[in-house]
């Protein structure tokens, strides 16, 4: 604002900057942290979080062809991305903007490729994070409108406008109607990820709120450092 421009023209207070999409590894950690799943343990061996089967096979060379990805369990699934195992020839598939490892880079690149959405909308880490975020909100609030407002504020640090809240409510109602017609799909959604869901919560409402939370996590204002 004008006060900062006048009193801090050199931005020594770091009070302003251009907006940018956060790097993939930061986004993964951010999603886990929003859900309360991020493990803060420091140090240790590399970990092997969720990854599609044989996704590295086409890029393998020589003896790497026989490499079997030893999928992690327990807390290792939720460690910070800095501990994720890297192959010599290719990085984790959920980090589209990571270094190509052909040359040294002092900072990560940033991307807005549409392929990024394949991860943020479908990766088990993101779906599980959305599920736990929804669970946490359902345990703390009762009314649907309160739950949606809480989810939006929790992720974006902003209070939703009446128009935005109306969109969230409409999205929730649509998802709830879909799951009422196909309750087995709600069970499938809530089964994604290693951690078990809270069976005390109604499955249909939990699944609908999970989908809305996933949408909120994928908003531009969520994925972008303002």
Model-found features: residue ranges?
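C-terminal structured "cap/appendage" subdomains that terminate the fold
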Residues: 138-210
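An acidic, gly/pro-interrupted, aromatic-rich
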Residues: 1-146, 195-226
